[in-house]
Amino acid sequence: MTAPAHEAQSPHQDLHESTGVESRKLAMWAFLSSEFLFFGALITNYLLYSGREFAAGPKPSEIYDIPFTSVSSFVLLMSSLTMVLAHNALSRGDQGATRTWLLATAMLGSVFLAGQVFEFTEFITLENMTLATNPSASAFYVLTGFHGTHVAIGVIMLLSLFGLSKRMDGLTDRQFLNLELVGLYWHFVDIIWIVIFTVVYLLTAAPGAS
């Protein structure tokens, strides 16, 4: 189904008086800002422990599978592209393409999550590195697990939009804002992972890093 393209400003949007920005979008930006600070604290916490030596068990940086995690990171990065394509499709009123790209984004996010579950399983069963092995392992699992939870929430939101579009034969002007908010959230999750992958995986696993 193809519907008229959405205009830049929907009449249903509730603008914040002082900023001229839609109130729900402003709230999302505020939420993401607080999450950015929280992730920053978790990354800092991991870095504080990553350079220390512990008697018990391996440190995460000693057992990373960088090629595998690189593929997972690429998959998540591509999901940002499909999210943009979903937004653009709805902007021009192409409801069918919107559903296709929403589903593609959710599937790519699910593949990333499956990769993370596989990585955790390998670390626990083969490398005997659990949450309680040492502070470095604990910091790693908390950081990456917290990010994985955000990805899972994003996948649920994407599938909800996909299901709503199927049930109503398209997304309305009001729901266009919902897609924009989900898009903001999803891009944030992707950017945070790029930071985590670079700082936590690549830099700490580099020769001489710890």
What are these regions (language model features)?
Residues 1-210:
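...captures the hydrophobic TM-helix bundle architecture rather than a specific catalytic motif
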